[in-house]
Amino acid sequence: MKDVILRNSRALQYICAAKKNFIMENGFVSESHSKMLICHFSDMHCDWKRFENVLSVIDYFSPTFAVHTGDLVCWDSQDDTQYFFDRIRQSDVPIYNCIGNHETFRQNEVLSNACLHGQYIRPLRHIQGDDYGEGYYYVDFPEYTVRLIVLNNYENEDVPVHYMRHYEIRQKQADWLIATLKECEENGYAVMIASHESDQEVPPNSDTGGFCQRYSPFPWSIPAPNEHHIVADIIDAFQYGKALKNEYVWSASGATVQVDCRFEKKSEFICYMNGHRHGDYIGYLPAYPNQLSLGVTCAGCFPEGYHNIGDETSDLPRIPDTVSEDAFNFYGIDREKKEITVVRVGACVNDRLEERLYARYSYGIDK
């Protein structure tokens, strides 16, 4: 733990700054550390050495929560991930998980949503709204009036082979999401959404803050399978307190989703958090420029086996047993300014010698 903390000393200063307030109100300085602090890591791919590094920083800072946005396994659900669940139970910080595309199969077997929920979601602590047991849930943080919603991007369990299981939000989850957001509207909760993939991809080189790499290499450069923006459309209605009525037909499966909802007042959406693309892609959705998406590169840096998962599709060099073997983010949430401070722990210098250490992004503001 000590080595990880010492070699990231600059990042740790920025994390401290990200959670600090220094505001004068009625002649007094406001509470100095009242911001929500979040750790976001993704695509661990069974790299337990680097996972221990993530845990070291989580335990050192005690953020409000941490979330891993999918692909715990090295290749598929034949891989043993019990170590992850054993270790997060030992942490005082609540750590959550999303289902990734690599979890959805075991060799040639396509796994049901119920099976995925039992293996990757049910072991988590203090989750709510998971009555259906199909990979999605939420967690409330009353002290901040924030709800974290975790989605299952891969509901299409009826595919004949696993490589046809693309991003699809089906009717039941869409209805559940609307009902969950209506509770937030009623109770005045702001919303964050975590999932393996973003509802719409942030294009490469689309961010001036430095946290969006220039290219999206194969196979992540193929046309996005998520041709519909069901979640983003619903969030837009939630943000602006308006109605949404639409029918969506997924081209791969032919499945139809009917959305007919109305929100009565404007509500606060903070951001999406996702991974999957093994690169940094922070920016705003092209369809909704006021919806911020925080896409993080993979936390794993596994040089053994078929490739170095951290290095091959990212503009960041990832060298085992150095500071660059790690790559994960901390976020400080400023609800008053509607601003998120992003701080990188680990690899933060790209191939152009540009530093990717910190940046600030507004959210929920019309552009």
Question: Which residues are covered by each model-predicted region?
Answer:
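His/acidic metal-ligating clusters that form di-metal
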Residues: 28, 59-65, 147-149, 161-287
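Residue-level marker for buried hydrophobic side chains located in beta-strands
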Residues: 38-40, 66-68, 97-98, 193, ...
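Active-site glycine-centered loops adjacent to acidic/histidine catalytic or metal-binding residues
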Residues: 43, 70-71, 100-101, 151, ...
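A short C-terminal boundary segment appended to hydrolase-like catalytic domains
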Residues: 2-22, 32, 286, 306-367
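Short boundary motifs at domain starts and secondary-structure transition points
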Residues: 25-33, 139-142, 261-263
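N-terminal active-site segment of His-dependent metallophosphoesterases
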Residues: 2-83
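Short, solvent-exposed loop/turn segments at secondary-structure junctions
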Residues: 45-46, 103-104, 153-156, 197-201, ...
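Extended active-site neighborhood of metal-dependent phosphoesterases/phosphodiesterases
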Residues: 78-182, 217-222, 230-233, 237-240, ...
